[in-house]
UniProtKB/Swiss-Prot annotation:
<keyword id="KW-0391">Immunity</keyword>
<dbReference type="GO" id="GO:0050829">
    <property type="term" value="P:defense response to Gram-negative bacterium"/>
</dbReference>
<keyword id="KW-0399">Innate immunity</keyword>
<dbReference type="GO" id="GO:0019731">
    <property type="term" value="P:antibacterial humoral response"/>
</dbReference>
<keyword id="KW-0732">Signal</keyword>
<dbReference type="InterPro" id="IPR000875">
    <property type="entry name" value="Cecropin"/>
</dbReference>
<dbReference type="GO" id="GO:0045087">
    <property type="term" value="P:innate immune response"/>
</dbReference>
<keyword id="KW-0044">Antibiotic</keyword>
<comment type="similarity">
    <text>Belongs to the cecropin family.</text>
</comment>
<keyword id="KW-0964">Secreted</keyword>
<dbReference type="GO" id="GO:0050830">
    <property type="term" value="P:defense response to Gram-positive bacterium"/>
</dbReference>
<protein>
    <recommendedName>
        <fullName>Cecropin-N</fullName>
    </recommendedName>
</protein>
<comment type="function">
    <text>Putative antimicrobial peptide. Partially neutralizes lipopolysaccharides (LPS). Exhibits anti-inflammatory properties: inhibits LPS-induced iNOS/NOS2 transcription, nitric oxide (NO) and pro-inflammatory cytokine production in mouse macrophages and human peripheral blood mononuclear cells (PBMCs); inhibits LPS-induced activation of MAPK and NF-kappa-B signaling pathways in mouse macrophages.</text>
</comment>
<keyword id="KW-0929">Antimicrobial</keyword>
<dbReference type="Pfam" id="PF00272">
    <property type="entry name" value="Cecropin"/>
</dbReference>
<feature type="signal peptide">
    <location>
        <begin position="1"/>
        <end position="19"/>
    </location>
</feature>
<dbReference type="GO" id="GO:0005615">
    <property type="term" value="C:extracellular space"/>
</dbReference>
Amino acid sequence: MNFNRLFILVLVAVLVVLGQQQCGVEAAPRWKFGKKLEKVGKNVFNAAKKALPVVAGYKALG
């Protein structure tokens, strides 16, 4: 059997097993990581939005 076919077969089997798991109301761990990452990105965006006018004003003075 070709290695590529074996790899694809194993990959499909893993995806089927992971796709059938249900965690009820609680989010799956992979989605929790995504939510945490999204929250970090939102915090960085908000901090940059607040800090950039201050930095621009400081550079204009100096």
